[in-house]
Amino acid sequence: NFSEYMALLSGNTDLLDKAKLEKRIASLEGERKSFHKGRRDSEFKLETKVKELGGNTAAIEAMTEDWNRFLAAARTDKDGNRLNAVRVDGVDSTDEKVIGKRLQEIARNATTGGLYKPIGELYGFPVKVVSERTLKEGLEFTDNRFVVEGNYKYTYNNGHLAMADPVAAARNFLNALEKIPSTIDQYKAKNEGLEKEIPQLQEIASKVWK
């Protein structure tokens, strides 16, 4: 650097030694700052990952509880297929086509103001609709989405009904509940990755600069 250059020109070895020492100190200070920044980053990542692991574990437990509750309540036909026992308020029929048409009417006309409004139930799980304001191609419109609620709000097709098929519309909530195991598996897979990543971050976060 410039200090070493000037020391060499002067022929003063004391100045040269001092310049080298200053350079070494500056280098060590840079290393120290870099180390502590890296450790702080690792500590933050570790905290985030530990929270994520805890949240995922809680979700798995809550969804497993819902799934077991659904299995205990669900009725099946002679072939073992789960029956669609959805009930919609104001509809006396158990016919899926009739129920589906009523659900499609709700999808077209509901205005809940952003609140989840109960409209029926399936095996004791409340079925609800929510009206959300959204933009499409620059225009605002009301998007009615449907959920079946346990410890979490479960959806099928992102909460949108099949508007061309009443029977498919009526089966939306059964489909949503039957997706629970695959959702649980997704959370378990995430946790497997986190359980490998967390010890590595713990090791980095516990290092001491020396």
Please provide the spans of the model-predicted regions.
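Acidic-enriched, low-complexity/disordered segments with a strong bias for Aspartate over Glutamate
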Residues: N12-D17, D41, D66, D77-N81, ...
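Short amphipathic alpha-helical segments that mediate assembly, nucleic-acid/protein binding
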Residues: F2, K18, E96-G100, V167-A170
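Coiled-coil termination/hinge junctions
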Residues: K49-G114, K207-K210
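Generic structural signal of hydrophobic/aromatic residues within well-ordered alpha-helices
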Residues: Y5, W67, I99, L103-A107, ...
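Secondary-structure junction/capping motif
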Residues: N1-Y5, G90, T94-E96, N158-L161, ...
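Long, largely alpha-helical accessory region at the distal end of helicase-like NTP-driven motors
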Residues: F2-R82
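Mid-to-C-terminal oligomerization/interaction "stalk" domains of large proteins
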Residues: A19-G38, K45, G114-K210
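Detector for Asparagine
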Residues: N1, N12, D41, N56, ...
